[in-house]
């Protein structure tokens, strides 16, 4: 993208480190501009607009090609996925059909399938549920991935709740 946009004075591509969480709007603004967006602020208050690549593509298709948004790219990943990768998916396709077209699950199958990411996603218990424009990923986990957690150094102080940029409460996961 840097190469493709090098002649565009109003576009800057800034590659980011693979780090979680870094995809949420407030984190993207902070890491790219250094501007903090406080709880009662909107990105526009900091002079920023953050658009998802999928949204930008849908707007382009609608405005320039006069075509409705009927597909999106979904990431199918996790140790239970036979062929983890990104797939172009038509809205309404069931998760079962999607998994089948994507090569299915590994032999031992999936213990848990999450729609979305590991922190903010939700469990899928019926694979006949259709994909929608908000479907972004399927995380397919093996038994080992979701096995009971081992004792850890956590002392249940709650500090993680105070500092989590995604406002996640780990004890509720």
Spans of model-derived segments:
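Short alpha-helical basic/polar micro-motif
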Residues: 96-97, 162
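Iron-sulfur cluster-binding cysteine motifs and their immediate structural context
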Residues: 159-173
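Short, surface-exposed loop/turn motifs that are enriched in glycine and acidic residues
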Residues: 84-88, 150, 162-163
């Amino acid at each position: 993208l840097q190469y493709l946009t090098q002649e565009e004075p109003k576009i800057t591509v800034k590659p980011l480190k693979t780090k979680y969480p870094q995809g949420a709007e407030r984190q993207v603004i902070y890491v790219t501009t250094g501007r903090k967006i406080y709880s009662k602020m909107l990105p526009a208050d900091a002079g920023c607009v953050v658009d998802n690549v999928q949204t930008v593509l849908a707007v382009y298709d609608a405005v320039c090609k006069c075509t409705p948004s009927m597909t999106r790219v979904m990431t199918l990943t996790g140790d239970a996925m036979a062929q983890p990768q990104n797939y172009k998916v038509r809205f309404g396709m069931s998760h079962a059909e999607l998994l089948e077209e994507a090569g299915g699950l590994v032999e031992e199958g999936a213990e848990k399938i999450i729609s979305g990411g590991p922190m903010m996603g939700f469990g899928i218990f019926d694979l006949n549920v259709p994909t929608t424009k908000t479907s972004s990923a399927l995380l397919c986990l093996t038994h080992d991935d979701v096995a009971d957690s081992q004792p850890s150094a956590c002392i249940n102080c709650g500090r993680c709740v105070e500092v989590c940029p995604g406002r996640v409460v780990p004890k509720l996961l």
